[in-house]
From Swiss-Prot:
Protein name: Immunoglobulin heavy variable 4-31
Disulfide bonds: C41-C116
Pfam families: V-set
Leader sequence residues: 1-19
Keywords tagged on the record: Adaptive immunity, Cell membrane, Disulfide bond, Immunity, Immunoglobulin, Immunoglobulin domain, Membrane, Secreted, Signal
Keyword Membrane listed: yes
Region feature Complementarity-determining-1, mapped onto this chain: 45-54
Residue numbers spanned by region Complementarity-determining-2: 72-78
Species this protein is from: Homo sapiens (Human)
Amino acid sequence: MKHLWFFLLLVAAPRWVLSQVQLQESGPGLVKPSQTLSLTCTVSGGSISSGGYYWSWIRQHPGKGLEWIGYIYYSGSTYYNPSLKSLVTISVDTSKNQFSLKLSSVTAADTAVYYCAR
């Protein structure tokens, strides 16, 4: 069965930004078609529960622009890209200072670089 590759990158705040919040992604780099892609973003240097921020997932298909997947607030409120809404779940675990992405029923069209961001 053909495998799909999912690349993870570290997205961190620039050094000149006063906030030293860093986001570290983790998850498999390889998922089979029809399976669920699960990624986690761990926030360090600040609390995910600090008000005023939305925690997002974004992806970039090869040779294309960025596509916003969705975001979550620390309270659990979510908003998803309408074109992906039926396949995507974003959740937050404030006790671990993490938020996660689940993308179900992946296909070759989901091959992309996945970013977490604030």
